């Protein structure tokens, strides 16, 4: 079982340097995040090592409007990822938001909420529900 992770860095008027994006990507990779492939996300296309989150040296000083770090993490490693994000946020000069993607289960995501609380992350007061209309459900 895994959670989807998306870290949306930068905003209009603020942006983000890829150097800061690399710091976050490498921190969460070391904590267990596995990044989406270059076919799935543009950021992976500029990584020299998709396992570590290392970005090409020649573009680290590029300033972008925004960029999303996307991947997955095993449920039992989410706490480590949250701690990595809290640690690296002090070393970057931009804003970011964290998204966690979870399939609703019989336990109403109590383990997710407990993990967030245990690591000092405020519980969300809103969410997005995709009911799967328009596409067949995954049968894989």
Describe the function of each predicted region.
Residues 7:
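Residues forming the flavin
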Residues 67-69:
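C-terminal interaction module
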């Amino acid at each position: 079982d895994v959670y989807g992770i998306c870290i949306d860095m930068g905003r209009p008027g603020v942006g983000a340097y890829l150097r800061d994006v690399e710091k976050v990507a490498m921190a969460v990779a070391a904590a267990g995040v596995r990044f989406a492939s270059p076919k799935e996300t543009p950021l992976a296309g500029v990584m020299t090592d998709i396992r570590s989150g290392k970005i090409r040296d020649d573009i680290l000083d590029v300033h972008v409007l925004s960029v999303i770090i996307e991947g997955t993490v095993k449920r039992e490693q989410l706490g480590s990822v949250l701690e990595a994000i809290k640690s690296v946020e002090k070393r970057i000069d931009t804003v970011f938001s964290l998204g966690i993607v979870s399939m609703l289960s019989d336990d109403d995501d109590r383990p997710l909420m407990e993990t967030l609380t245990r690591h000092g992350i405020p519980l969300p007061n809103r969410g997005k529900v995709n009911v799967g209309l328009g596409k067949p459900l995954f049968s894989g």
